[in-house]
Amino acid sequence: RPFFLEGAENYSTRIKQFYSRRIGEIPWGVKLNGKVFGWKLNALTTQSDPSYTDATIKKGEDAVYNVIRLTRETKNGSNLGLIGADRFYGDGHSGSLGLTSTLFVTDVLGMTSQLIKTWGEMDKGTWAGFIRPAYDSPFTHFHVRYSHYGAGVMENINPVGFVVDDDRREFDTNLRRQFWINRYGIDRFTAGVNYNRYTSQAGVLRSWEDENSVTLQFLKKW
């Protein structure tokens, strides 16, 4: 699948609005890559029979797939972007349009986020997204992330993207600290805490996990 593999990183996002394996054999495809007024532009359009990847669809009628990504980078490494992905099949569209950002406030403080509006089979619970502020230094990592998936997101995105679950509100946080010892035969000591919890949109608890870890790395020579 060279057509999709080359430049696949241009459409990579945490919530996968575009997943090339949703598209089977293609008779043709067009790509566009370049810059427009300081914005990086990536786009593709192609055609395929969706029954190649979805056994519930009858073989015979092709769908048209369109994907576009615009990204603007700043001098400090931050970026803002827009990504859209759509499948036109029969007389209907399925897909999503999303805003993405990676912001570096200081050398150690940053934030990533994604906000998505979906369309397709479902007309309620069509929003998804996450926000993740983080602190990263040579010895410490800390982040808090909140994710939201409406109850109709999976049905709308998955004809052209990939979401494993929806109807959820998720909170997770991670703290990890590394201490350099370099004596008593110990090279370094690392401690970490990871917490994850998610509920349905109605507030019903579906899963939670609390994981604590301690790691010792010894010197090669005592």
PLM ranges: what are they?
Residues R1-G34, K40-A43:
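Residues that cap or anchor secondary-structure elements
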Residues L32, A43, L70, G98-S101, ...:
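Conserved structural-core and active-site-/substrate-pathway-adjacent residues in large, well-folded domains
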Residues G24-W28, K35, E61-N66, H93-L97, ...:
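Residues that define the transmembrane beta-barrel architecture of outer-membrane proteins
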Residues V36-K40, S78, L109, S137-T140, ...:
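Secondary-structure transition into beta-strands, especially the periplasmic turns and strand N-termini
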Residues E25-I26, F37-L41, Y52-D54, G60-N66, ...:
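Outer-membrane beta-barrel translocator/receptor signature
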Residues Y65-W119, I181, G185-Y195:
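Surface-exposed extracellular loop regions of Gram-negative outer-membrane beta-barrel proteins
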Residues S113-W222:
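Exposed, low-structure sequence patches enriched in small/polar residues
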Residues K16-Q17, S48, Y52-I57, A85-R87, ...:
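Extracellular loop and loop/strand-boundary signature of outer-membrane beta-barrel proteins
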